[in-house]
Amino acid sequence: MGHFTEEDKATITSLWGKVNVEDAGGETLGRLLVVYPWTQRFFDSFGNLSSASAIMGNPKVKAHGKKVLTSLGDAIKNLDDLKGTFAQLSELHCDKLHVDPENFRLLGNVLVTVLAIHFGKEFTPEVQASWQKMVTGVASALSSRYH
């Protein structure tokens, strides 16, 4: 799953404290749905997803994006037990929603992009490396039920 050094943990926690969960969550999920349109099939109940502007302005996309990043906050508090932290969500996404686990990796990569946009120069290569390790670990934990 990847071992987090104390430096990784400090880097992730420090940046996370500055993240606006609502804004970053909505933008991350919105970008996922625009850039990877096949992911939209999991969000039929969200209404109008017909264009980039419709998706980015959709209140249900924003609300679910906030929910996703809120659960990521739980992961950040439990970096040494990502699998345990996401056991129930893994089961839900695998058994009930049948989400392709590759989508977790895509979402993590989109989040890293959004953080880079929001934090600019502060999002150094070292910060990116720690965050990439974290989103990869989260994707792996969410995919654990599939194995």
From Swiss-Prot:
N-acetylglycine carried by residues: 2
Protein name: Hemoglobin subunit gamma-1
Species assigned in the record: Pongo pygmaeus (Bornean orangutan)
Record keyword Ribosomal protein present: no
Record-stated family: Belongs to the globin family.
GO annotations of cellular component type: blood microparticle; haptoglobin-hemoglobin complex; hemoglobin complex
Modification S-nitrosocysteine, positions: 94
Positions of post-translational Phosphoserine modification: 45, 51, 53, 140
Single biological process term from Gene Ontology: hydrogen peroxide catabolic process
Ranges of residues in domain Globin: 3-147
CDD domains referenced in this protein's UniProt entry, alphabetically: Hb-beta-like
One GO MF term attached to the UniProt entry: organic acid binding
Tissues expressing the protein: Red blood cells.
Domain of life: Eukaryota
Subunit relationships: Heterotetramer of two alpha chains and two gamma chains in fetal hemoglobin (Hb F).
List of residues that carry Phosphothreonine: 13
Gene: HBG1
Positions where N6-acetyllysine occurs in the chain: 60, 83
Disulfide bonds: none
Keywords noted in UniProt: Acetylation, Heme, Iron, Metal-binding, Oxygen transport, Phosphoprotein, S-nitrosylation, Transport
Function of the protein: Gamma chains make up the fetal hemoglobin F, in combination with alpha chains.
